[in-house]
């Protein structure tokens, strides 16, 4: 007897939102190794580092939207904390955390 067709729903996860010392950025250039140049919402270009625990799990490309944690002692450097997917970017736009124009402008 065949199984009944069940509606497949993707589990909805909470989208990480920027907290104190964090900002949303767009990957501008890959430098090699685990370093990237990112353009942040505050208009600054920062040198970002992919930490070891997410280096092999999360592949980066130019134009990806990421959440970064800014270093306290060097504000022009940061660590990648999370990479947003397309559906998560739409959810951020719907919640008015970031505007679509800003994303389009940062992606250039």
Swiss-Prot record:
Keywords: Initiation factor, Protein biosynthesis. SUPFAM superfamilies: Nucleic acid-binding proteins. Residues 11-85 form the S1-like domain. Gene3D superfamilies: Nucleic acid-binding proteins. One of its GO terms (molecular function) is RNA binding. Pfam families: eIF-1a. Transmembrane segments: none annotated. Coiled coil: none annotated. PROSITE patterns: IF1A (PS01262), S1_IF1_TYPE (PS50832). Seems to be required for maximal rate of protein biosynthesis. Enhances ribosome dissociation into subunits and stabilizes the binding of the initiator Met-tRNA(I) to 40 S ribosomal subunits. Belongs to the eIF-1A family. This is Translation initiation factor 1A. The lineage of its organism: Archaea, Thermoproteota, Thermoprotei, Sulfolobales, Sulfolobaceae. The gene is eIF1A.
């Amino acid at each position: 007897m065949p199984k009944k067709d069940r509606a497949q729903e993707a589990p909805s996860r909470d989208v990480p939102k920027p907290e104190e010392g964090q900002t949303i950025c767009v990957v501008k250039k890959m430098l090699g190794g685990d370093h990237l140049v990112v353009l942040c919402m505050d208009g600054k270009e920062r040198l970002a580092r992919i930490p070891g625990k997410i280096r092999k799990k999360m592949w980066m490309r130019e134009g990806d939207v990421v959440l970064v944690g800014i270093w306290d002692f060097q504000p022009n450097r940061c660590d990648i904390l999370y990479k947003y997917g397309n559906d998560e970017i739409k959810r951020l736009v719907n919640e008015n955390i970031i505007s679509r124009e800003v994303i389009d402008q940062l992606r250039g």
